[in-house]
Amino acid sequence: MTTAINNNIVNKEFDLKDKTFLASGKTKTIYQLNKEDQYVLIESNSAITAGDGAKKDILPNKDIYSTTTTVNNFKVLQLSGINTHFVKQVEPNAFIAKKCSMIPLEVIVRRLATGSYLKRNTHVTEGTKFNPPLIEFTFKDDVQHDPLVTEQDILEMNLKIGGVPITSKLLSQTRHIATLSFEALERAWQSLDVTLVDFKVEFGITSQGELILADVIDNDSWRIWPKGDKTLMKDKQVYRNLPSALNTPGATPTTQSGPLLNTLSDQQLKMIEDNYAWVATSTEKLVEFTAANLNNNNNNNNNNSNNNNNNTSSTSRSNSLPNVPSITTTPTLHHHHHHHQQQQSGVGNNNNVNSGFQVQLNQPLVGIIMGSQSDWETMKLAANTLTTLGVPFETRIVSAHRTPDRLFEYAKTAKSRGLKIVIAGAGGAAHLPGMVAALTPLPVFGVPVQSKALSGVDSLLSIVQMPAGIPVGTVAIGAAGATNAALLSAAVLAPYYPSIELSLDLYRKKQTDAVAEIPVDNPTSTSTTTTTTTTSNATSILSAIHTSTINSNTSSHNNNQQQQQQQQTILPTQPTIINTPTPVRSSVSRSQSPLPSGNGSSIISQEKTPLSTFVLSTCRPSALVLPPGSTIGILGGGQLARMMAIAAAQLGYKTHIFCPENDPSASHVATYTTKSNYNNYSALDIFARQVDVVTYEFENIMVEPVEYLTKQVAVFPDPKILRTCQDRVLEKTFIQSLDIPTAQFQSVESFNDLKSAIEKIGYPAILKSNTMGYDGKGQVKLTDQVDLEQAWKKVTSETCATKAILEQYIEFESEASVIVARALDGTELTFPLVTNKHRNHILRQTIAPAQLPEYIHKQANEIGLKIARSNGLVGIIAVELFVVKNNETGQYSLMVNELAPRPHNSGHWTIEGCVTSQFEQLIRCVCGLPLGSVDFTKRISEAEFIQQQIPPIVMTNLLGQEVNGWEKILQTKGSHLHIYAKGDAKEGRKMGHVTQQ
């Protein structure tokens, strides 16, 4: 339950003298306010300690610096929509907070690997980035020095705090809120070019049974590195790193039966004090940065500002915020101690985050209307974008010519129903936007829908030519216009709704990052066909989609018939979606706009976030795992997805295939299958709600849909790796940046570029399409006898690419590959190096292990691990290599040819040849499980295999009609046959494989 804290509470004068001592810790004391027993006074002291209090100093003014830092951090979180216990600052070194029963856990959020994490994970390099941030729990127990605990450890304690049991769901909520809090502060610190490395927070339970962020967040709670430089750190770690007290010149330590006191010299004290003062001052700027957009429109809202629910403490700078009725504050009760464990939790020196106000996005703010059913194909892109940004909306067909009464009613009541903006899409005569603008005072954005006759130019001219005094903000024709109308709407709302502002900033940053990496070559239109089936008899369970209602928690006092009709989402018919008789998720009720329940949820209250279905490992304290029984989504339905699904089933996971093909190979073994184009965002929304993690079977999938999924569900490997591997120029540039050799290359964007490039590279050379090439498609070997213009046309036409890459032709001894697995916790392994033989550019045979010198095996492993670490891989990646022999020395060396961030054809032999196959290893990686052994099934290492001269394992692809020899293959001793059930056995098509041991 969320309760507003109004100005009466914020402006209330508390009797600070009438108080009762509750508890004290190393750095603060907590008092019960007797006349306001639902509140406490938290008073900081000037002590600074390290080593669980083993050494202690008194730092001048630390009490003021700590309180200032804490209060400012709470304000940042309030502005970001995160609930905390903070009410107001009442003294330079004290603030009022809501009373709550403290959960005896610290939640640690790590962006970079450093400190104690490195001591426990020696294989991880300092500075390794965790994305998403890594979450750890410690149990508050001074005797045991706050040990690291797993979720299972916590659940076995059977904790019940404030009458609320500590369940797996509640722990998931703490992870989610802690992550949001970290990201809000991280974003604010970035504005000052400071890296927030990690922090720790605590939670409490209010008297209303509500989970809330509590305690303090000061300079003892985090690591911050200005300019990302550890040597410039300003946090408490500087104090921890100072030499032992007895060896400190100028210090006068006291060691009598307790902590080591007065360990610092005057010079050291001054340095630490300066750091704490700098941090306290800097956090003022964090508040300014976070509140900037909220304050931009302050002058336009002075008439409303007296009613603001502003829960920030009083300072010399007034943060007057626009009056938005849906902004409320949630009270958080603090430090109500019932027993020993809770008392300990309330007095620790670790700090918690608080925020006072949260935007309640519980009714539509934007109305999306269109003239007809056919306009939905365009207008749903506006709906998709609003979904991404967390903006609640409604959608309705309102024809200016065929339903004028409906139009009049809709426009006239739009403002009274709480809408702030209307997006109107229409084609042809396109009168809808203008007529709505004439009837409502709300801003109207007009989207010209592309018409068959004049390609939308008629629509554009009809909308844009409005007379003076009746404005319609007109955007581009078609898809771009629909998307931009949604973005403009979000930009208008952002100053009043912090969660929308944050989402919009993240969206813009992602757009910038994408453009900086690589432009999109081949955008395709959204599909209109989606079908979900299973291997059992399928039945429809989503018929409610066609007439669902907005989950709008508006007041029921005026719910007359007209309001009820307007709350109903009357939408164009969605794609047909059939699902399995076994319910996939209970949350399938949703608006036909691809927004859950037609409603943008607040940034705290979302039930599902990308890692919300992961839990802490029961045996590895730092690890997140997805438990068996969960569903793994796989983009693609070919043989790789098929073998992934089989491996997943072996470990107890369900799989859900998403692909556009009819009767895909993987559908025969997967639990669920969705038939849809990859850029059907409505289908992707449903898919994301039905799975717990997503991976993909091939790298030539469109990146944008994969990136879209990351907002709703964890996707591994990261789509950024996908972008790199799809673009050969970007891929080779990345590899060379790691000082790993590749063939010389030149980017080619035109025939003239090709002529210039061949002069630099020389003959012979290989011309390849820059994207989408596979199994020899889109490439030509160039000699001085080849017509360059014809080669250019062939390469670009075969793959519909607009760019190419010209590579130096490498005279290699053989081709090889190494597959690297890297888990969610950063552990990593390489499969044995193999050599590959091709026929007509298609892999024919793989020999494992490669019959090459041991130093080449070592070099391949080093290359693979370097690539995996550098791109933050979670999953598996195959590194295709050229083995080059120096004819003078007889020495071999390796050059990287290509990367594939998925299971690889050259790894199929691992199904029978290794203890853990590449497919099982992928499942382990994306689900956070421990990596499996990559030893041969003979239980010997790669080096032992080579030394004992055991005959290699051979995997042979069955191409085309070769699969018809399946019976003969089965008669061969030591053969393991895999048939992919792919239909027509076309020439060169991979129909199966056989592994011989």
From Swiss-Prot:
Keyword Lyase: yes
Low complexity: compositionally biased ranges: 294-323, 342-355, 524-536, 575-597
Recorded superkingdom: Eukaryota
Residue span of region SAICAR synthetase: 1-305
Biological pathway: Purine metabolism; IMP biosynthesis via de novo pathway; 5-amino-1-(5-phospho-D-ribosyl)imidazole-4-carboxylate from 5-amino-1-(5-phospho-D-ribosyl)imidazole (carboxylase route): step 1/1; Purine metabolism; IMP biosynthesis via de novo pathway; 5-amino-1-(5-phospho-D-ribosyl)imidazole-4-carboxamide from 5-amino-1-(5-phospho-D-ribosyl)imidazole-4-carboxylate: step 1/2
Single GO term (MF): metal ion binding
E.C. code: 6.3.2.6, 4.1.1.21
Domain (ATP-grasp) ranges: 732-927
Any one Gene Ontology BP term: 'de novo' IMP biosynthetic process
Protein task: Bifunctional enzyme involved in de novo IMP synthesis, an essential step for de nove purine synthesis.
Family designation: In the N-terminal section; belongs to the SAICAR synthetase family. In the C-terminal section; belongs to the AIR carboxylase family. Class I subfamily.
Protein name from the UniProt record: Bifunctional purine synthesis protein purC/E
Source species of the chain: Dictyostelium discoideum
